[in-house]
């Protein structure tokens, strides 16, 4: 299968290089509105990165004639679909902020292990030679969500449901069709889960701080 366009690969690298509002691990005491704004921005960057990476992998390795049927088969692939998390904005609006934060945290934590193997999936080092930075950005978002949970509960941690299952590692054998389909499915789930986390955070932010950006 043909290699993906260099320009699209450079786009993903550029997204990885985007500055964050705070350095990794930096969540000092700040107003609740700022905590939400920072977490939403981080989630948006990660979701965009996941979406572009999925499209790059698709163009590079998945024949166009097979994409539709494979995408339909992926509908029930993500194990995150087995937890009672809202599937969209309308459902999210029916949940409490703490519920949405817990679901967001579960989704982020489920990818902390798998993303460390992304650099072995793409031979182009410009894309995932910096996969450790993807991991750092996920850890940063995890910390931001935990900061919000502490703030909303006055610093008293509260145990939530634990997602014991995590996603498989990405397969590095790109000469195998089965491995390509597995990686394609994992990237699809990565994109879906980050979209959910972004949606939950935006719903909470808009619910607490009415603003023009609430229309999404």
Curated annotation (Swiss-Prot):
List localization entries.
Secreted
| Signal sequence residues | 1-26
Pfam families cross-referenced by the UniProt entry: Hormone_1
Q: Which Gene3D superfamilies match?
A: 1.20.1250.10
Family matches, as CDD domains: somatotropin_like (cd10285)
Give the record's GO biological process terms: animal organ development; growth hormone receptor signaling pathway; positive regulation of growth; positive regulation of receptor signaling pathway via JAK-STAT; response to nutrient levels
> For Zn(2+), which residues are the binding ones?
45, 198
Task: Note the SUPFAM superfamilies from the entry.
Answer: 4-helical cytokines (SSF47266)
In terms of InterPro entries, this protein maps to: 4_helix_cytokine-like_core (IPR009079), Somatotropin (IPR034975), Somatotropin/Prolactin (IPR001400), Somatotropin_CS (IPR018116)
One GO MF term attached to the UniProt entry = growth factor activity
Look up the domain of life of the source: Eukaryota
A single GO cellular-component term from the record reads: extracellular space
- Provide the primary localization: secreted
> What keywords appear on the UniProt entry?
Disulfide bond, Hormone, Metal-binding, Phosphoprotein, Secreted, Signal, Zinc
The disulfide bonds in this chain are 78-189, 206-214
> Which sequence positions carry the modification called Phosphoserine?
131
Q: Which PROSITE patterns does the record cross-reference, listed alphabetically? A: SOMATOTROPIN_1, SOMATOTROPIN_2
Function, in words: Plays an important role in growth control. Its major role in stimulating body growth is to stimulate the liver and other tissues to secrete IGF1. It stimulates both the differentiation and proliferation of myoblasts. It also stimulates amino acid uptake and protein synthesis in muscle and other tissues.
Q: Which family does it belong to?
A: Belongs to the somatotropin/prolactin family.
User: What is the protein name stated in its UniProt record?
Assistant: Somatotropin
Q: What is the source species?
A: Neovison vison (American mink)
Q: What is the lineage of its organism?
A: Eukaryota, Metazoa, Chordata, Craniata, Vertebrata
The gene from which this protein is expressed is: GH1
């Amino acid at each position: 299968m043909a290699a993906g366009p260099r320009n699209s690969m450079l786009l993903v690298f550029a997204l990885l290089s985007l500055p964050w509002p705070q350095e990794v691990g930096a969540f000092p005491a700040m107003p609740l509105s700022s905590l939400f704004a920072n977490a939403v921005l981080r989630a948006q960057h990660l979701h965009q990165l996941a979406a572009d990476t999925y499209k790059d992998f698709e163009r590079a390795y998945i024949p166009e004639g097979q994409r539709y049927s494979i995408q339909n088969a992926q509908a029930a692939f993500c194990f995150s679909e087995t937890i009672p998390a809202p599937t969209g904005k309308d459902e999210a609006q029916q949940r409490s902020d703490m519920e949405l934060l817990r679901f967001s945290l579960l989704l982020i934590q489920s990818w902390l292990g798998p993303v460390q193997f992304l650099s072995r999936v793409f031979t182009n080092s410009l894309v995932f030679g910096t996969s450790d930075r993807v991991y750092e950005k996920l850890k940063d978002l995890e910390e931001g969500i935990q900061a919000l949970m502490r703030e909303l509960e006055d610093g008293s941690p509260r145990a939530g449901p634990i997602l014991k299952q995590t996603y498989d590692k990405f397969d590095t054998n790109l000469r195998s069709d089965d491995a390509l389909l597995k990686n394609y499915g994992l990237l699809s789930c990565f994109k879906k889960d980050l979209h959910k986390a972004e949606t939950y955070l935006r719903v909470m932010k808009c619910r607490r701080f009415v603003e023009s950006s609430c229309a999404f």
